[in-house]
């Protein structure tokens, strides 16, 4: 009898979940709450004066909310840890992160919408010409703690010394650190490398090749299968319609492409 009761309850829960609409699944409070890395131009940018978010992720959130027929709230996070915590605490419904196996132990990664390329940033007169030149004895590589690039260089570089920063230093400090030789290389995404190169005049140089290609994905709390299914369908439609490509182009992003949709 006990087993029959348990079975009956499981069936009821399954039926309830199946009956939920996409808006109830993705925005259970009635508002779609989305959290992203506000300091990562590949995801989006936040206007310091107005607080308005623009870029691929804000475009995706607004379109998803429009389709669901609900209001939205876009939350800017300083780092991946804040995003993961928000999903665990249910203070956000969906998040956006670059895929990493360590992060996938804390949250479930859904459909990828972008592929992000990553390029090392060096002093303009540096002897380092390509990514393969970096992992050498005596080379000092800087990266920001917990970011995709730091996770990669800390685990893959064998000879170079990795120096981890808590946050991304401002442009003037990046120029000073590279110019003085305190660090030889910054490991950041290609868009940031190119932005820093442009802002420096002729002081800095982004390497032309990519040391890492990473998918930018929707991310949800562990076990939220219904959310992942709804997101997969949504992203597939936007990928095929050209919506994501238009969003990337509108943001004038370099070193970013539409994800292929291949299963991970």
Where are the model-predicted features located?
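A ligand-binding cleft/hinge motif common to bilobed small-molecule-binding domains
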Residues: 81, 97-106, 152-155, 177-212
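Bacterial N-terminal signal peptides
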Residues: 6-15
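Flexible hinge/capping segments at coil-to-helix
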Residues: 122-141
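Hydrophobic residues within well-ordered alpha-helices
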Residues: 64, 86-88, 134, 174-179, ...
């Amino acid at each position: 009898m006990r087993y029959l009761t348990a079975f009956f309850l499981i069936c009821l829960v399954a039926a309830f979940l199946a009956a939920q609409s996409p808006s109830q699944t993705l925005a259970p409070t009635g508002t779609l709450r989305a959290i992203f890395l506000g300091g990562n131009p590949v995801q989006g940018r936040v206007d310091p004066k107005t607080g308005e978010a623009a870029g691929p992720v804000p475009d995706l959130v607004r379109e998803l909310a429009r389709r669901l027929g609900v209001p939205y709230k876009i939350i800017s996070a300083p780092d991946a840890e804040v995003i993961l915590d928000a999903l665990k605490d249910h203070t956000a419904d969906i998040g956006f992160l670059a895929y990493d196996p360590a992060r996938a132990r804390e949250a479930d990664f859904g459909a990828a919408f972008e592929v992000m390329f990553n390029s090392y940033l060096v002093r303009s007169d540096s002897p380092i010409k390509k990514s393969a030149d970096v992992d050498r004895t005596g080379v000092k590589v800087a990266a920001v703690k917990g970011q995709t690039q730091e996770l990669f260089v800390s685990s893959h570089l064998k000879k170079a010394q990795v120096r981890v920063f808590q946050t991304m230093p401002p442009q003037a400090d990046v120029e000073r650190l590279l110019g003085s030789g305190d660090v030889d290389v910054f490991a950041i995404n290609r868009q940031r490398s190119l932005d820093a190169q442009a802002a420096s005049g002729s002081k800095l140089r982004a390497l032309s090749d990519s040391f890492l290609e990473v998918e930018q994905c929707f991310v949800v709390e562990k076990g939220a299968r219904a959310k992942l299914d709804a997101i997969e369908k949504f992203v597939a439609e936007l990928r095929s319609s050209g919506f994501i490509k238009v969003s990337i182009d509108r943001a004038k992003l370099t070193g970013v492409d539409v994800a292929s949709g291949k299963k991970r």
